[in-house]
């Protein structure tokens, strides 16, 4: 998989060189490239924004600069992802779907966003998805891009040491979209708090039933919108 990220703050993407994403890059499982949008500017000030038509606060990122950048980086096989609080909600299912893509490009906006014509123009040549990571607003799309890239990479074969590690994660299909229950490790007793007895029993059927029940309970309490009929 190839991933390109376009931004005016390349250093914001440095966390992707660490931990599991970093290992995926080093091992060749993913080809990650971060591009400074200002490279495609032509004025002495390297301007990437201008005042919005119709008035209003803030600045809007200019279409010509973004157009040149995407023309050079993208192809008809690209899935262009535009992080925006006005986008469709990013979920585990989204991350899973993107693992089948060969080329992801993230266009990280700033200020009041990117001129909408950039999205419209790109959609004539490739697939485009405007995506939000939650009902809140960030200064730019870089943090959202890091979140989404990490979510996708950990699902790629060979990234996690144990391929089964993500199969029973919260929101995963292996858990029917529910929240994962609590985890425990040694010691069995700590500061007067004991690990649930069932987890020490060695009875795999009982353990599976217990995990299912606490998963359902946690989901009902914390995310009733995800509640499961059983």
Swiss-Prot record:
**PANTHER family for the chain:** TRNA (GUANINE-N(1)-)-METHYLTRANSFERASE
List the GO terms this entry assigns under cellular component, sorted alphabetically. Answer: cytosol
InterPro entries documented for this protein: Alpha/beta_knot_MTases, tRNA_m1G_MeTrfase_C_sf, tRNA_m1G_MeTrfase_TrmD, tRNA_m1G_MTases_N, tRNA_MeTrfase_TRMD/TRM10
Q: What keywords tag this UniProt record?
A: Cytoplasm, Methyltransferase, S-adenosyl-L-methionine, Transferase, tRNA processing
- Residues crossing the lipid bilayer are none
Tell me, in a sentence or two, what this protein's role is: Specifically methylates guanosine-37 in various tRNAs.
Q: In which domain of life is the source organism classified?
A: Bacteria
State the similarity comment. Belongs to the RNA methyltransferase TrmD family.
Subunit note: Homodimer.
**Cross-referenced Pfam families, in alphabetical order?**
tRNA_m1G_MT
Q: Specify which residues bind S-adenosyl-L-methionine according to the UniProt entry for this protein.
A: 109, 133-138
Q: What class of enzyme is it?
A: transferase
Name any one GO molecular function. Answer: tRNA (guanine(37)-N1)-methyltransferase activity
Q: Per the UniProt entry, what species is this protein from, by scientific name?
A: Mycobacterium tuberculosis (strain ATCC 25618 / H37Rv)
Q: Where in the cell is it found?
A: Cytoplasm
Misc:
Was identified as a high-confidence drug target.
Q: Name one GO biological process term.
A: tRNA N1-guanine methylation
Stored NCBIfam families: PRK00026.1, trmD
Q: What is this protein called?
A: tRNA (guanine-N(1)-)-methyltransferase
What reactions does this protein catalyze?
A: guanosine(37) in tRNA + S-adenosyl-L-methionine = N(1)-methylguanosine(37) in tRNA + S-adenosyl-L-homocysteine + H(+)
